[in-house]
């Protein structure tokens, strides 16, 4: 049976956690941030957990993660 391909777009955006979940960067941080408050930018700085509903599709997209 051939190897399964990893979706490279998903591999760039998501990282697997130790317990089997996935984390991703917060959205709305790329540009046009001058109108945001410092508090808003600070809260967007970290990583977010992916919802459990979406983890099954991520497992299919990244079979070796």
Curated annotation (Swiss-Prot):
Residues 1-23, 36-65 are annotated as: Disordered. Pfam families: Ribosomal_L35p. GO terms for cellular component: cytosolic large ribosomal subunit. Keywords: Ribonucleoprotein, Ribosomal protein. GO terms for biological process: translation. Residues 54-65 have a biased composition (Polar residues). This is Large ribosomal subunit protein bL35. It comes from Francisella tularensis subsp. holarctica (strain LVS).
């Amino acid at each position: 049976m051939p190897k399964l391909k990893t979706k490279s777009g998903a591999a760039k955006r998501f990282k697997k956690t130790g317990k089997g979940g996935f984390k991703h960067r917060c959205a709305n941080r790329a540009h046009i941030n001058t109108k945001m408050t410092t508090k808003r930018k600070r809260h967007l700085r970290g990583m977010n957990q992916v919802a459990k509903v979406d983890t099954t599709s991520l497992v299919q997209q990244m079979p070796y993660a």
